[in-house]
Amino acid sequence: MKPYEPKSWVTRVFLVWWLTALSCFFISGRLIYLQLLKGKWLKEKALKQQTVTLKTFQPRRNICDRNGIPLAIDTLAYDVFAHPLYFSISIEEVANKLSPILCIDSLSIQKLLKPTSTGICLASQLPENTGKLIASLRLDGIDLIKHPKRYYPYKEIVGNVIGYVDTSHQGQAGIELSCQESLQLNSPTLTSSIDGRGVLISHQIPKELFIQDNLSLQLTLDLELQKIAYKALKQGLENCKGKRGTVLILDPKTGGILTLVALPSYDPNIYYDFPIERFKPWPVTDLYEPGSTFKPLNIAIALETKAISPEDSFYDEGCIRVGDSIITNNDYNSYKPLPCLPNTYNKIVKLLANSSNVGMVHILERIAPEIYHSWLSKLDLGHAASPLETDLPWASESSLKDINEFVCYEIEPAAASFGQGLAMTPIKLAQLYASLANGGILVKPYLVTGLANAAEDTQKAKGIDLPSYNIRKKNLGNHLSWHKAEPSYLFLKRSGIRVTDLLRHIKAEGRFALPFRKNLLQLFTQDAHRTTELQLEPKAHQPQLLRPTRHAVYATNQSKRVFSHETTKLLLDMLEDVIWNGTGSSCFVEGYRIGGKTGTSQKHTQEGGYSKTKIITSFAAIFPTEDPQYVILTVIDEPNIPLSFGSNTAAPIVKSIIESLIDIKKMKPTIPIIKVKKD
């Protein structure tokens, strides 16, 4: 028997070569398939696994008054979500613990919680202190989602001016709407690499994200004056039972709006509880016929055209027919003429002091209608002029009859002589009075000064109505800062949290949730700002103006002259006589020089013509007349007391404001106070 002989080495080599070649063939084929056919898809998949895109949170800029006092600020609110599937205690126990904090009956909470359900919203928009109380309970399956909330500390006092933001943090009214681009910062996106554990690679974070922006939108408003006007108007409306009212205070030299109050107002913090018509800033949107408050402007026009001189006298018969219409003075009695004004000659100052309609008709008869119309157009009245923009939305243009109608119908210039037949917004009339106060310059009213950097980072709270939760100071530079100076990627690394876990539970608008961890639900990008508390103090400090607005530049550089200095000086003296000897005596303040004019006008009806019962009363004042610093206009819509006039409805409101102004500004009397010695 032959011994066993193994196969030759050639056979074995061939077998090894064949197996190796076959393996290389399959490997090469697989590589070709992955590289050429699936390469693009695999590359995209790898990038998705190795990078993460996060949207950083950018709070809105604060809105502050002229002294830097915040009027609108960003703070934090919480939404509470429950996941009964992950409760470590019974539903009843969870409901009992949450009930006193949420102020919801325990049984009602239990009805919402299904044992196998998840993601149940129990409450939303909770203040920060309430959120912290819930977090302190350390309940498994209860998540708190942070999100920004706009807070308005002065509520109805500035509601009509500031406006509000909706649930998506977008401005919907007032300054919040008109200055949306200045208030809303762009939210940059961050694309960064992550390691195999899902932790952000720190050197991938661009330094640009940490650039600070502490700018606030500064207004011309003076909060202290705003409070005074709000209180005076509220009391005045109650006294005269008016439908609505407004107070405007302008700086006649610059056009800056120091005060804009409109009642009834609304609380921007809970805007959804108020009717939608209150969101409109009607002092800049709604037209009305100014009535007798327009008479000083007509006298100024007559003086400028040389149609009259200051010492001229006019026959005032108390009643006059113009075309098919009869015009009477307010105090005229057709059956028994009063001995005061009718059937007498009076100088212009007397006609204005007693608010004579007939006297004004005679004055304007000396001016050709086309010239008078051109002067009204020069004052930017009528459709030819653009709406008077004041940084508030929905501004309206004034109303003036067409020149052909104005010339062909003699009643039109006659009615305009005492402020009827033409219409304007309250802010427009205040602008015209500012031209009388500043020497004849038609300044442009504006509300927004520009973007300013506060002179102080922190102010201490004092005498301000703040909510019970802390208000955080925005620090736009530290977008990715979790706590003071600890970047988020370090927090995630220290906590062992994977970014991939965050991505699985991403929420709307860049909100990242960890719903299955104990009390760990956080907003990754919304702990962007530091936890420094913003404390408020209503004390004056001047912010540094960095970027003035277009309107502010226009007001200082592009104002135009409409009246001469001599004419406005005469008008100031006449308006002062209205306070001393005329219909404005109810605004007299002893020791101080005030100029003003009352106004009462009929309202239009929907059917056409004028209402016999509904009127608008007003009072415009310039204070002090020797050096005008304030133009104050009060308008009352539909006062409902017997014998309602501007003198007994609007003028007392202006007097109250001036008395408060004197007190807070420490203004000394300029006229000797005569004290009568009593026997």
Curated annotation (Swiss-Prot):
Primary site of residence: plastid
Membrane topology classification: Single-pass membrane protein
Annotated TM spans: 13-33
Keyword Nucleus tagged: no
Subcellular location: Plastid, Chloroplast membrane
GO molecular function: penicillin binding; serine-type D-Ala-D-Ala carboxypeptidase activity
InterPro entries, per database record: Bact_Transpept/Beta-Lactamase, Beta-lactam/transpept-like, PBP_dimer, PBP_dimer_sf, PCN-bd_Tpept
Keywords noted in UniProt: Carboxypeptidase, Cell shape, Chloroplast, Hydrolase, Membrane, Peptidoglycan synthesis, Plastid, Protease, Transmembrane, Transmembrane helix
Active-site residues, Swiss-Prot/TrEMBL: 292 (acyl-ester intermediate)
Catalytic activity: Preferential cleavage: (Ac)2-L-Lys-D-Ala-|-D-Ala. Also transpeptidation of peptidyl-alanyl moieties that are N-acyl substituents of D-alanine
Top-rank EC class of the record's enzyme: hydrolase
EC number per UniProt: 3.4.16.4
Entry GO CC: chloroplast membrane; plasma membrane
Domain of life where this protein originates: Eukaryota
One protein family per Pfam: PBP_dimer
GO biological process: cell wall organization; proteolysis; regulation of cell shape
Gene3D superfamilies the record matches: 3.30.450.330, DD-peptidase/beta-lactamase superfamily (3.40.710.10), Penicillin-binding protein 2a (Domain 2) (3.90.1310.10)
Keyword Transmembrane helix: yes
Other notes: The presence of this gene in the chloroplast genome suggests there may be an unsuspected vestigal peptidoglycan layer in this organism's chloroplasts.
Family indicated by similarity: Belongs to the transpeptidase family.
Designated name of the protein: Peptidoglycan D,D-transpeptidase FtsI homolog
Species: Chlorokybus atmophyticus
